[in-house]
Amino acid sequence: PSMDARRGDVYNALYKNSEKITPERAVSLEELLNELDGKETVFTGDGVFAYREKIAEKMGGFAYFAPPMHMLSHASSIAYLAEKKAENGEFDDYHTILPVYLRTCQAEREYNERMKEFKTN
């Protein structure tokens, strides 16, 4: 999956079938496409809406795009994955599940900059 992280970056993780082969990360679209060069890849996520033409241009016949109804995450998909894990005896403690933030939001970055300036004055 790829999510538009703005400024030419995408949030993503790479999977082969259901095995995760990279951690969640924020990388430039160019870096991601160079990593995938010559590998058949299915693209999902809102990053596809923003970068489909660039992906197709760079990847050519190696790029496949999920149909629109499967492009974005749905709660039912998360429930399905949880069910599959449970069938394999894997359970997550819902009290410990947290979102993954790969970089600070713009408001937080600006606040930190102001605080840094304030401390130096």
Q: Where does each model-flagged region fall?
A:
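Acyltransferase
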Residues: A66-N121
